[in-house]
Amino acid sequence: MEAQDPLFDLIGLGFGPANLAIAGAIVEKWEGPSAGGDGGISAHKVLFIEKQPEFQWHPGMLLPNTRMQISFLKDLATLRSPQSPLTFLSYLHAEGRLLPFINRGSFTPTRREYFDYLSWAARTVESKGIKVQYGEEVVSIRGSEDNTVEVHSRDVKTGTIVIRRTRNLVISPGGNPKLPPNISLLYPHPRILHSSRYATSVDQLLGTLSPANRPLRIAVIGSGQSAAEVTLDLHSRLSSMPGGDRPHAIDMIFRNGSLKPSDDSPFSNEIFDPDTTEVIYNLPTQSDRENILKEYNNTNYSVVNPRTIDAMYEVMYDQKLDDAIARRKGDKATPSAARITMHPHMTLYFADDLPQLAETDSATETSQEGIRLTLQNVFSQAQSTRDYDAVVCATGYDRTSWLRMLTSSDIGKHFGLNLSSDPVQLVPSTEIPKGPDGSLFDASEEEATWRPASPITPASPSPPSTPTSSALSQSRMLGQLPITKLYITREYCLVPNSPQFKPRIYLQGCTEATHGLSESLLSILGVRAGLVVDDLWKNSQ
């Protein structure tokens, strides 16, 4: 274990786009007209800790020719400060591609170019004094006697634990790959991938399968953008691989009736505007915020860009054309392209590990490990079993790791959290109860409200009450649990129960319940970073 003496003004957990935007806003403060004045965050006392060995951004989904779904103007800084040196236009100018990009006639760069922009921005802020410790994974945070926060991180190569202290903390955990429960029981498995690892793992996966020289069967679970992109990429790859007397098969499995287009029309896109974040945060009830999230769900979740849907339909239409021509000609030649089949209205009922697929290659007598999926129709409840060589899960991300970190830390007690705090509801600080004299109520465990047990999601409001012992017993019998309210400001800062806790802890990318749908997206990075950094400066001595 290694303890580092310097006390940091700010430590950021993670160094993805969210904390990169924070770093950029800090650099602008350092270089701005008020630089060198009282207060603020001291230069060279800012550190970001990142698990990856270098800056990364969704490497598993950097597929060929995939485009961003937002304008390049929604970059790290433009909406906050168009004159910032960290805008996408500044990147293009620095790289000598400004005019060629203009000549493209498109506001949406490729995903590959946007990753290069983010990498350029990371190098730029580091050159201006921001410290980034790559190759370390944060394992815990703890309170310190001097009212600072201890950050414990592990060197991913050596296993050495490093302890650092900070006055303020920004938690930007990103998302952890989420697998269907039945699949997660088998994971890790050499034949199961999450879409977050697809581009970096698919070559190795197909390399282990290709020697079989037989038709491969691969399942893609999900109905969103990642699922569609993975399916199209698999189709392209498998179409060039020999498969014996039948084409390779790709099955898309999803609960919906079809792939649904994302709504990126101008009025709907305003849901991602910073002004809309203000509106959502200040809605009077949690129920109102839930209704807004539900109304605009089709702008972000389980939807596919219309261009991608068109490409998918074109591939499947060509399959029908090939079939018709083959029937007319009586052509029994081996089809050259892989085939995509959709299985709508299906849920995953059961998953099992197959040591060997039933079908073996007659020439080599070899077989491959596989996965057996039992699917269930959501209407008829009818079940069917299918065997696959591999399964790719494009099933989204879990964004609650920050909560587990807090509840397992002694810092959690300052926010009313402990290991038994389940469920937890993130609530705007404007809803903190006030005492009879109008002062803010000292939130504590006594301020629990009651509701049926549910995951960590926005909950319907109920009036604060302290249940009697009989009410507590009855609630437990009915499967109800006390809900712990965790308050957060408009500036993304968690509100402690007591003013005695001085460190400021900010959340990035995980406050959708209070700040709206744009929270986990790139759309408001620059504006959000400005709010956080301004709040840090205002509250720093």
Swiss-Prot record:
Gene Ontology biological-process annotations: biosynthetic process; intracellular iron ion homeostasis
Positions annotated to bind substrate: K74, N269, E270, I271, F272, N300, S523
Signal sequence, renumbered to the chain: none
GO molecular function per UniProt: ornithine N5-monooxygenase activity
Induction: Expression is induced under iron-depleted conditions.
Tagged with keyword NADP: yes
Cofactor note: Binds 1 FAD per subunit.
Class of this enzyme: oxidoreductase
Binding site for NADP(+): S223, G224, Q225, S226, N300, Y301, S302
EC annotation from Swiss-Prot or TrEMBL: 1.14.13.196
Pathway: Siderophore biosynthesis
Residues annotated for FAD binding in this entry: E50, K51, Q52, P53, E54, F55, Q56, W57, H58, Q69, S520, L521, L522
Keyword Transit peptide annotated: no
Region (Disordered): 430-474
Catalytic activity: L-ornithine + NADPH + O2 = N(5)-hydroxy-L-ornithine + NADP(+) + H2O; L-ornithine + NADH + O2 = N(5)-hydroxy-L-ornithine + NAD(+) + H2O
Key words, A-Z: FAD, Flavoprotein, Monooxygenase, NADP, Oxidoreductase
Cofactor: FAD
UniProt xrefs under InterPro entries: FAD/NAD-bd_sf (IPR036188), Lys/Orn_oxygenase (IPR025700)
Function: L-ornithine N(5)-monooxygenase; part of the siderophore basidioferrin biosynthetic pathway. The biosynthesis of basidioferrin depends on the hydroxylation of ornithine to N(5)-hydroxyornithine, catalyzed by the monooxygenase SMO1. The second step, the acylation of N(5)-hydroxy-L-ornithine is catalyzed by a not yet identified N-acyltransferase. Finally, assembly of basidioferrin is catalyzed by the nonribosomal peptide synthase (NRPS) NPS2 via amide bond formation between three L-AHO molecules to release the linear L-AHO trimer.
Subunit structure: Homotetramer.
The family this protein is said to belong to: Belongs to the lysine N(6)-hydroxylase/L-ornithine N(5)-oxygenase family.
Name assigned to this protein: L-ornithine N(5)-monooxygenase
Lineage: Eukaryota, Fungi, Dikarya, Basidiomycota, Agaricomycotina
Name of the gene this protein is made from: SMO1
